[in-house]
Regions:
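Amphipathic alpha-helical repeat scaffolds of TPR domains
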Residues: 6-41, 62-83, 110-131, 159-182, ...
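An active-site-proximal "capping" alpha-helix that borders the catalytic cofactor pocket
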Residues: 400-410, 476-489, 554-571
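Acidic/His-rich, divalent-metal-binding segments that scaffold phosphate/diphosphate chemistry
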Residues: 329-478
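Helix-turn-helix repeat elements of alpha-solenoid scaffolds
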Residues: 29-56, 82-102, 132-154, 182-207, ...
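Flexible helix-coil transition and linker loops at the boundaries of alpha-helical arrays
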Residues: 56-67, 100-114, 147-165, 198-217, ...
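Extended, non-transmembrane interaction/recognition domains
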Residues: 280-283, 299-314, 322-352, 385
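Histidine/acidic-rich helix-loop-helix segments that form or flank divalent-metal centers
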Residues: 160-163, 210-215, 422-448, 488-534, ...
Length: 607
């Protein structure tokens, strides 16, 4: 592999270490801030070096001009970057596989085409961001198209070597990957693709032809994927799908002991739960038995186990428990109420005790699932959102800063133009606005605090400080507004917090920003969203402590940009506040002193 690729990997790992510093509680405040700032500057320098490496060796390369040695080096680099859920850099693996695929097409090298179709498809799948049941799935169609093209080479199967045959079968098995599965119609299409692929994978002809291929692993992985239909079955009584899910659950449960050690990617803690849940939907057991199984999993897990498996058993298992508790008869629910409440309290104690310097993003995902399941059960708790924010410290710092700045802008707007807030929080007159100004300011703070909660779905991109974002990654990041909206709707924020999350990147005049194709921001929250939009840009652009993907801008420079985009991107009423010298002075002091305080609070160091 080219030594420059080795340098890229070294830089990547160094930046990841610098981006996730661990501080002792007794560290001096000045030392902590200086360390974060120094790390950010170092990360920026590493990023520039990595961008130069990628431009030279990947982004600016013509596929037709690659030599055999360069192809081998690129393939080794891509394989090093991609390792499914444990990938070093999934996005760059995708770009390299794309380059290699174009080269293979030019050369007419069919084995290489199949190999790189699989590589490009599977890396794009892991790069892609997906909502619940794949309802949000920006690159799903592309992923399926690539896998289906690779699977199409089954027509020439006998002519290929064993390695290529393995990739054809992987493409075939994954051809159902990224398919939506939230409605009966979508499940029907999913099952058609699944059954076709499984029919070939279990066909004795192919197994006898190549007995050394890992047929059991292919089959096991497909059965695991079909278990995702349990989410569908919790909403629909579908005996046909339930029978298929039961079939997969039995296969997984039967083969669970076969995949350990290096094969653990195919095995996880959920197997016994999946079996019980499938039994319930197939009419073979009660909801109480599913809940009992989950309680057993939770109670046999160390409450101080903060490994990924420990987090899933202590938290994700609770979300599944919530989902099946509501399906129990009232008498069973009353009888088990103490035990289920005890588990909920236990999960909150667990969250409170997670070492903050080791806070895993797995925690964030587990809490999201818990919120979603509680929403289905009608018991969602808004307080859980704070645990999502804590999972990524830079986002937590930014959210706290934006919360304070939004409240500051709204407070000033209430003084100068209270009429703008008629309609907010049900206020029908200016006098009602004045009487509700404290509550409006607190709502503004909450909107700012949770505006980026949807980024918990895309932490893998916003934590990328070792190279520039790819266009595909930026597209995924843009969905954080919609994810945030859905998450906040689940906790009762549909009329205030959720719209703030959805619209904070939409231009004031409606002709720019994202997301696209949504109705205008509701008038009864728009004044707060307008203030939030300015506050968001202000903090992101001026953070001179931890920001490392670009250099911070001077406040005066940014004020000029606000004025230049007044009436288009930013609300005139908010930008007008920046003409007040006293307010601007207070704003600059807030940006400086408050930012330091927030960093110290988030990293748990006292001033």
């Amino acid at each position: 592999m080219d030594a420059r690729f080795e340098r890229y990997v070294e830089n990547l790992r160094t930046v990841r270490t610098l981006s996730q510093p661990k501080f002792s509680p007794d560290m001096k405040a000045k030392e902590l801030l200086e360390t974060i700032q120094s790390n950010a500057i170092k990360c920026f320098d590493y990023m520039k070096e990595n961008n130069a490496i990628l431009n030279e060796l990947v982004f600016q390369r013509a596929p037709a001009e690659l030599t055999s040695a360069e192809i081998a080096s690129l393939q080794e680099f891509a394989d090093k970057m991609f390792n499914y859920a444990s990938s070093e850099d999934c996005g760059i693996a995708y770009k390299v596989y794309s380059l290699l695929l174009e080269n293979a097409r030019i050369r007419g090298d069919k084995p290489a085409i199949v190999r790189y179709l699989y590589g490009k498809a599977v890396s794009l799948h892991y790069l892609n961001v997906r909502g619940r049941d794949y309802a949000i799935n920006p690159y799903g169609t592309q992923v399926r198209g690539l896998f289906q093209e690779g699977a199409g080479y089954i027509a020439e199967y006998e002519s290929f070597d064993k390695t290529t045959k393995g990739y054809i079968m992987r493409c075939l098995g994954n051809s159902r990957m990224s398919m939506p599965r939230s409605t009966p119609e979508e499940c029907t299409e999913y099952m058609k693709v699944f059954d076709k692929a499984m029919g070939i994978i279990t066909d004795p002809y192919y197994r006898q032809l190549d007995p050394d291929l890992p047929w059991g692993k292919f089959e096991y992985a497909m059965h695991m994927d079909r278990e995702t239909l349990l989410s569908y079955l919790r909403r629909y009584n579908d005996p046909v799908v339930a029978a298929k899910v039961m079939e997969s659950a039995e296969a997984i449960y039967r083969d669970r002991v076969l995949y350990k050690g290096e094969e653990a990617r195919l095995q996880n803690w959920r197997v016994s739960y999946l079996y019980k849940a499938a039994c319930f939907h197939a009419g073979r057991c009660t909801a109480r038995e599913v809940v009992e199984e989950l309680l057993d999993i939770i109670h046999h897990t160390d409450i101080q186990d903060y490994s990924d498996t420990g987090i899933n058993k202590n938290l994700t298992a609770v979300s599944y428990l919530v989902a099946y508790e509501v399906k129990m008869p009232p008498a069973d629910r009353r009888e088990m109420a103490c035990r289920t409440e005890e588990v909920m309290d236990r999960s909150l104690r667990y969250l409170n005790n997670v070492p903050q310097n080791q806070y895993s993003r797995v925690v964030s995902r587990a809490v999201r699932e818990l919120v979603e399941m509680q929403a289905e059960a009608g018991t969602a708790r808004r307080s859980l959102l704070n645990y999502i924010l804590v999972a990524h410290k830079p986002t937590y710092v930014h959210s706290m800063m934006v919360a304070g700045l939004t409240r500051m802008f709204v407070k000033q707007m209430l003084k100068k133009s209270p009429e703008l807030f008629v309609g907010v929080m049900g206020c029908k007159t200016v006098e009602e606005v004045r009487r509700s100004r404290i509550e409006i300011c607190e709502l503004a703070y909450e909107c700012g605090l949770y505006h980026d909660v949807g980024k918990s779905y895309v932490f893998m991109y916003i934590g990328n400080n070792y190279r520039r974002l790819l266009d595909e990654e930026f597209t995924c990041i843009q969905w954080h507004t919609v994810f945030g909206y859905e998450l906040l709707c689940n906790v009762g924020g549909k009329d205030d917090l959720a719209p703030a999350a959805l619209y904070h990147h939409t231009f004031y005049d409606g002709h720019g920003g994202y997301p696209k194709n949504y109705p205008p921001c509701p008038a009864d929250i728009k004044p707060i969203v307008d203030a939030l939009t300015v506050a968001d840009s202000l903090d992101a652009a001026t953070d001179n402590i931890g920001r490392c993907y670009t250099m911070a801008k001077p406040v005066d420079t940014l004020l000029g940009e606000f004025h230049a985009q007044r009436g288009t991107r930013y609300a005139p009423e908010v930008v007008a506040l920046l003409d007040d010298e006293d307010f601007c002075r207070d704003l600059k002091e807030t940006l400086d002193e408050t930012r330091k305080s927030v960093y110290l609070e988030v990293y748990h160091v006292k001033r």
